[in-house]
């Protein structure tokens, strides 16, 4: 499986579309705001949108922290579509959305598409980097550390590339570049594949 990053043109088009969708976001109730989040992130907690993370089962603390950073324009070194989405969210909105997504069911492992060789390499890399120390032994996340298990593969790969390239700031930016140092794109792809297809041992 090859993961590709969208072109500048497609990213720009996505930002315009999101901007139009959320132009009156500040005027909506918390329930309506949550419904608009579902447009990209999935109503059942599982995203079916490319490069867009699933939020079901994410720790509330993590969701609130990320929305806070987006609202302040401090989530990345370049503007993101989420900056515009979050700019009119109040603190009560952040807490409500955090609680909502934490209660949603986490995404399930994909039913197909797993590559045994990539899974083995990814597992070895993840265990050698002690990812479980911060993200929990089952990669379910805790506090400000996100859930990694069964996250979208394309999103995991992009996030790791951004951390490795120091393009992502905020929580994690102090430790993740060091944790990913020395890993090539193929290594990151194997890690993303393993985590996306992770199954908790019985």
Locate each region found by the language model.
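N-terminal secretory signal peptides that target proteins for export/translocation
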Residues: 1-12
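Bacterial N-terminal signal peptides
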Residues: 15-24
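Sequence/structural segment immediately N-terminal to covalent heme-attachment motifs in c-type
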Residues: 28-44, 109-110, 114-137, 152
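Residue-level hotspots at or immediately adjacent to binding/recognition sites across diverse folds
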Residues: 43, 81-82, 137, 172-176, ...
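Gly/Gly-Pro-rich "capping" loops immediately C-terminal to redox-active cysteine motifs
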Residues: 45-74, 83-88, 123, 127, ...
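Short, tandemly repeated low-complexity microdomains enriched for cysteine and small residues
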Residues: 77-85, 110-116, 172-179
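C-terminal capping alpha-helices of c-type cytochrome domains
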Residues: 87-109, 154, 180-202
